[in-house]
Amino acid sequence: MEPNLNGPDQAQALRERGDWSDLGARILSGLVLASAGVVAAFFGGPWLAAVCGAAVVAMSYEWARMSEPNAVTPAFAFLLAGALGAVLFASWQHLSYAFGWLVLCALASAVRRRTLTGVIETAGGAIYIGFPAALFLWLRDRAPEGLETILALFAIIWASDIFAYFGGKIMGGPKIAVGLSPNKTWSGIITGTTAGALAGYGCGFLFHASADFRVSWLIIGAIVAFTGLMGDLFESFLKRRFGVKDASRLIPGHGGVLDRIDSLMAATLLVGAALAFGPRASALLFGAGL
């Protein structure tokens, strides 16, 4: 049976798949951000801490606007103190202090908001922003494979994001969760995860891993990519919860900083937790004698 392309659902699907109006701005801003991220990661130290700090400032403001639109300034100040404090501790290589600071800020939020929902929103924002940022700096400072870890994260997440975007746009198909994000499709998830797996395999090859370890990179690339895509979906849930379309309009074609690096934040949590609390995870990736 031929599909009915005249119905409202089909027409909407065609509009979504054919809307490339923001592609130029999306590519240009993405290239600028990617270049800044790679350069900062390469130099590490205070350079990367400064970039992470700038991102934390922007994300804290975006979260404050979403969660407390009638009290942006005090919300921003609290979130900034929590998340930026975690970044500072992590830049001094005190990851445990960073986590402890976030816990203290979460407890302090009870004094300010006084309701369970308010505490969850404020404390959750500080942790959601500060935890991945601190882990990201910690991952970079790990010797001797810190830079390789960050570059692999970039490669996997960027490949996944790009192919998920184009795969979903071109192929369309069934939606994942229309109530959360009306444009995300299973085809995008599949193409994004596949691209992330291949990017992971490529990283294993570039890092001179043996054939067996390249298979590990392939599998972990898929896991990291899928985690990043779920982080993107979770960000959509948060925006729906707060009743906004984008976290902000800071980045042309992407929305806000939270919109742009949600996948990277989720992947950083996964990789950081695995390497911090699972010693075998490091051997699994870098056991080939890097």
Each PLM stretch: what is its role?
Residues 159-169, 227-238:
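Short helical (or helix-break) motifs at transmembrane helix termini and adjacent helical loops
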Residues 27, 63, 162, 233-236, ...:
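Generic detector of well-ordered alpha-helical packing
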Residues 260-277:
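Final/C-terminal transmembrane alpha-helix of multipass membrane proteins
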Residues 169-170, 239-242, 265, 269:
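Re-entrant/interfacial helical elements at transmembrane boundaries that shape
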Residues 275-290:
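Juxtamembrane boundary at the C-terminal end of a transmembrane helix
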Residues 241-264:
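Interfacial loop-to-transmembrane junctions
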Residues 2-222:
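Membrane-embedded alpha-helical bundles of polytopic integral membrane proteins
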